[in-house]
Amino acid sequence: PVASPKNMVDQYYGIARNHDEAQYFANVTNLDAAVGKLLKALKSMNLDQNTLVIFTSDNGPETLLRYGPRSGRSFGVADPLRGMKLWTTEAGFRVAGIMHWPARIKPGQVSGEVVSALDFLPTFCDLAGTKNPENLKLDGTSFLPALEGKGMKREKPLLWVYYSALNERRVAMRAGKWKVLARMNFPKTKTINQKNVSQAKGATLSEFQIFDLSQDIDESKNLAETNPSKLKELQNTMEIHYRELVNDSHVWE
């Protein structure tokens, strides 16, 4: 992690179990202080009331000791969610999403809308009063209605295809309250390149699981067998959007 000032690390000795945990706690404190400086700067320039500030993360807590015994600073937890970073279960990508915009957002609200970083570009286009780029097929949806207390209308479900995920079902989809996981019949790999891209794009899905996250946030009750009609519906939806995503994907080298 990013190194923190010594005085911040020192304040956690006696509280933390060891030096590495003190470093982790100091990192969190340092991040909080940095966000505070940003908000204070906006206020000093009289920009705080009409500036949208978004605080979020790119993934869940670091997987324990992923880099071996020397990486002793993996102290984040995501209970009661299942998994951690590098998983396609909820703990892999369900993260904090805090938005501050006093002129437009009533403080203290909690929204149940599902929002992704994929939604940033269409939202910012919406805020700027412009249209999404016509030459781009965007997977996200503007969440401006959610900021105004209205419901979002997401035309496409959110889809994750993670070739090197640590769990076995490396493709995930979120459609409303439903979560779908599926196996990808393609070997785990960290890189998609010209040598394996054809095989990757031809990979099929199997062994689908479905979960009602409104009742089962830790994804412990697979409803595939007890709700076959919903399984078929969600499986078909995932297949369509999975194929669209992999066919439109580029190889970056």
Regions found by a protein language model. Give the residues of each.
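Beta-strand elements within well-structured catalytic alpha/beta cores of enzymes
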Residues: V28, V35, L52-S57, A96-I98, ...
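C-terminal cap/loop subdomain of S1 sulfatases and analogous C-terminal strand-loop tails that border
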Residues: P61-T88, I105-Q109, E113, L118-Q209, ...
